[in-house]
């Protein structure tokens, strides 16, 4: 519940489409200091790993605090444990841990020294230097100087990435390569719009493909502030009405109660449309204990990585187009959608009677039965299973879990629209990129569901004569 409380206001704005801003905020953010150019390359990785949050923009030149260092060493410890390396006896004798550069080096080295990494016996300075986690100014390592937050974050980030690279580890992603046989290549990365199951770090192969692209294309342009503002406006009522005017009084009160448990007041909730609340509640249900406090979905990470590297960004659709799919859902569907989101957010064994009655009125008595609760948990588990296939580049496994044909054949108003309305335009965009003159290498990042199936991008390009293959695992 702690993670959900922390993220509810953010996710209400992000929803499943991602990249929007919240329509309200508790307070204005402090003015940011310019970051040094050398740090741009590590920001997306450090943020996604949870090494730091937005404080990096205002505190990066300040001496790292003990609490911040503790957070970083915990992240390093958790990530290195996932490599399942052979353990070794503790090697912390004589290591002084403080907030100097040397103290930070020792703290990070101590976490790596729990495992039999090659060269670990050389000691803190030599090992950290050998894996690219420690560098000086050309004359010395400046170990006695205070360590800034940014320096500490860069050390921790480099340590994790280099040790993962050394072990050929990291998330591979559902990745295909399409080419026209005449010099144009388009990598296709199927995204899953969540951050669970230790998504980060990405494997070096995938990070390199991002950084070597001439252009990166997403479903939406996460950097277009005008479009983001337009989408944010679509999520709230602008005709003088509130949520209370569009759903039953009982469902409205149930929504207010659940939102209060997640840290939002009635005034904030009332302005949002039912579909915006529903997508947010269902997204929150997919988060787990592995989700970084920054909860950076795959497409948002790739966007940050590419944008920080100065790579041109493009988009297949507009926020208005995709938002319109949700905005045009029937009132009846939106009410059911919201009730379903609430059902995923509450504990039916402890929820108050009024909320139970409100959910039953919309969803029926079976909504509160054990079988339904088991089905909901199965859906959440399915997200986790899909993420495992994503991390391992198991396309067949993903397609087995994600039955696109069943979705297309269903009478669900939303699911079918998300593919019927979007797949053709995505196929055309990819084909246009591949058919342009010259030699180009691009990366297209859209929902994995759009990649697969008979109507998906991969098959659509094959049908047009392009060569499309799953990228071999490194």
Give the positions of each predicted feature.
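Extracytoplasmic Gram-positive cell-surface binding/anchoring modules and repeats
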Residues: 26-77, 86-122, 134-159
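A recurrent domain-boundary module in secreted/ectodomain proteins
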Residues: 149-166, 469-474
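Extracytoplasmic/secreted envelope proteins and their assembly/folding machinery
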Residues: 40-43, 66, 70-74, 101, ...
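Structured, acidic catalytic/metal-binding patches in enzyme active sites
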Residues: 177-414
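Sec-exported extracytoplasmic/periplasmic mature domains
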Residues: 48-51, 74-82, 109-113, 129-133, ...
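A cross-kingdom marker for long, charged
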Residues: 407-474
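Sec-dependent N-terminal signal peptides of Gram-positive bacterial secreted proteins and lipoproteins
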Residues: 2-25
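Catalytic cores of RNA-modifying enzymes
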Residues: 171-173
